[in-house]
């Protein structure tokens, strides 16, 4: 055991916050690092840490003529993604974790992990990262402190969060903060040679909702180690939102302005592989319309003094899936990356010191793949891991809305829920009211691929696209959504309208009916015109869909039959959906709000009343 007084840097804290100082000393005593460094967020610190990571072989400096001030990382092949089976919600009461989360009693988990943490930072530096999710100028800034032994995490957190000395100053001596503890779990004996990506076979990502703590061990991958992201901003924040009357959601936020200059804000929840980042950075194909980005992944929504729901993006960077991001699908993301200051992980490296991944056009004749091996277009495997990532400052996005910086957030006019369904779900459906919208979100689904499941087209529920991220019982989460619909003054007209979209419907030959990408602006146009009371809709058993000719398809290479099928509500397909929803709802027992059962019964009755 190393007494904390002997750990270099332990007594050089740039703060007098007593609870923070006590916690740092406690963790230093437990983990026994060689030294403690308080991350200040400066350019000099970025240079020092990236230089050290390059020297250690963890990072490769990219060609500055291609990607200025940018780096490439290659992880251990076993440490490439979030590990949901090792992710726990350690609520005091097991029932509060619910059927969608892994649970362990908090005392048992802390005993287990305390032994893993004991001496786990030996031979390494312990970094203390003060950070804030969302603007520091907010009425109630959302502070966090991450303790980590990974310099890769320090560099990435500088991109993804507002962090450093300015956060410590804003915290003063008494601000509350989320305690976020992370270790890669790879202590070094004296003289032991380090590896380029240290990690541990044993992994835990544990959340303690009542005490607002996160303990992560064994993984250096971003989703498991950048604890401000999913761990704080969704799992812990969703519990805070439940307790305090707001929502923490897995949603993009965009601003759309019509040719007449009227601006609206839309939030959208989409499961993975459904184009959330692409929609957030949309380039409209219809003349006169403009889209700006507020956020691509997380939205915190609170009621404003006017009774409307306002959203902020708590993140400072983009942590996007690389494959499939290209000039055709998301030119604004590519422009953001071209401005440099980024970290790329598990993509491929070109011979001239740039990065490449599948989807970026013709592959070069030679690459070094994500495992460090030679790769050519004749290779039988992909050059980049399917979950390879870019980490880049959102402030470099060329269409970032000025509203992004507003600590009060932006007023949300519409909420989208979207999944990947080859049939059944129309291109766009408008909910009848807020509770019907919650039903649509609670039953949100996507189809798995053959690679993921061994069977194409298996429908999996992903409520509000939050399945891996709800920090408490999902039945209570649905109830919280319903309660939020009562607003602050009972005026439902101030609530966002809710829509369910599906860009992925296919025809009988298996081809996508809708072109997607920039053409999705046509669906957003119809939604805006619905908000303004100008677009026609048709009543169906599942909600309102665009009337014939209400959707602007001018210039699209689509037949009227294609459009009809894309918007079709097939009674037989929807009746086949009912037992799947029933099975899903039964998971939650008496925690499921009765109004959602009532919505299902009403849908069944409307379908039964339709002519076959």
From Swiss-Prot:
A biological-process GO annotation: response to lipid
Catalytic activity: oxaloacetate + GTP = phosphoenolpyruvate + GDP + CO2
Organism: Salinispora tropica (strain ATCC BAA-916 / DSM 44818 / JCM 13857 / NBRC 105044 / CNB-440)
Domain of life: Bacteria
Gene it is expressed from: pckG
Location(s), subcellular: Cytoplasm
Protein name: Phosphoenolpyruvate carboxykinase [GTP]
Active site: 274
This protein's UniProt keywords: Cytoplasm, Decarboxylase, Gluconeogenesis, GTP-binding, Lyase, Manganese, Metal-binding, Nucleotide-binding
